[in-house]
């Protein structure tokens, strides 16, 4: 009888550990985020729900990654256009990265905002912009400057639905 009781306790403990590990894995690896506003159109629109990967290293954040970050207490979603070491400038509505004209998917949109002086990103800084880059459509690094690695909450993984 004592052997059965000890086996039951051992199995319960193992089951509890597995459940706890799954809980931690799910809640600390993936996090849902509801897109608000039109700054990321046409890629994402208001009301879409995206999942973010919240366990990542600095090398996982690349040019083109879409990230969720905190700025003045608000969570925002933007695309990374500049990574540590990059030099950026906006001249006549065109974004230049490391002296090269931005040729990304959203480069055809005239870039509003100012970055008339070259900005070289420090070791933990990222330059982020909304995909909807016309005037007043995106509050991003053109407005509030570079985003630090510590401000980034997660990297967008996929869209899972609508609110």
Regions flagged by a language model, labelled:
Residues 115-163:
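Beta-strand-rich cores of mature extracytoplasmic or soluble domains
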Residues 1-75, 147-163:
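Protein maturation boundaries and topogenic segments
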Residues 61-63, 99-100, 137-139:
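Short glycine-/acidic-enriched loop or helix-start segments at secondary-structure transitions
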Residues 55, 72, 93, 131-132:
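Short, surface-exposed secondary-structure boundary micro-motifs
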